[in-house]
A protein has these predicted regions:
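Short loop/turn elements at secondary-structure junctions
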Residues: 1-28, 157-217
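Generic structural motif
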Residues: 30-34, 105-106, 212
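Internal mixed-charge
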Residues: 108-195
């Protein structure tokens, strides 16, 4: 099942997240042979499909000297060696070209594991975590986008909380974690999620995630 938010959603709140706090163990792809033209990014050495790169992931590029040129939202994966990307929040219809060039150093990191934990947490709060067959009941959520902000805040909470102990700037990261804890709890308190139990496109039930705090495993 898809998470309720993606990496590009996180960047709308934390533009430097993938530059500052990328987790090496969660790196999908990287290389030194990136090339750009329009919104097309290619890497002859890549295997984007096998790496699991998907729309909503974030492409970070640098020049050979290590100077950052930005982070961009993946729009689509065209082949094993080619993807389309543009400024975060834009679509193919209103896309902005990538900086043109060759020999780009690039990284595709993800916080999908954290977003997946938050997805399960939100479903648990809604009583949808597991059915009799051992499957979750996310399909019952009529409008999954209503959970996007909660997913973003919960994911950022886990990212900052998880890295606050090890980093030199741990105090600042802990403060960020506390901020997203407040935003997460506030979002949960006002959320009302409509459920469609008979797949007719209409709500049969409305639930609130409640006020239980997100706990790290």
């Amino acid at each position: 099942m898809a998470n309720f938010s993606n990496d590009a959603d996180l960047m709308k709140w934390e533009p430097t997240l993938f530059r500052d706090l990328a987790v090496p163990g969660q790196r999908l792809a990287a290389g030194v042979d990136g090339a750009t033209s329009g919104i097309t990014f290619t890497s002859a050495s890549a295997s984007f499909v096998d790496a699991g790169v998907a729309p909503g992931h974030v492409l970070r590029i640098e020049d050979s000297g290590g100077d950052a040129f930005g982070c961009y939202e993946v729009l689509s994966v065209e082949s094993a060696t080619e993807l389309l990307a543009t400024q975060v929040g834009r679509t193919a219809a209103d896309s902005v070209d990538l900086p043109a060039g060759t020999g780009w150093v690039y990284f595709l990191d993800t916080f999908d594991p954290q977003a997946e934990e938050v997805r399960f947490e939100l479903l648990s709060r809604l009583g949808l975590a597991v059915d009799d067959d051992g499957e979750d009941l996310q399909d019952l959520v009529l409008q999954p986008r209503t959970l996007r902000r909660a997913s973003v805040f919960g994911t950022l909470l886990m990212v900052f909380e998880g890295q606050s102990g090890a980093a030199e700037e741990g105090r600042n990261l802990a403060a960020k974690a506390a901020l997203y804890r407040r935003l997460y709890d506030k979002e949960l308190a006002k959320l009302r999620v409509r459920l469609d139990r008979d797949a007719d496109g209409f709500a049969d039930d409305v639930r609130s995630p409640g006020s239980i705090r997100l706990q790290r495993g």
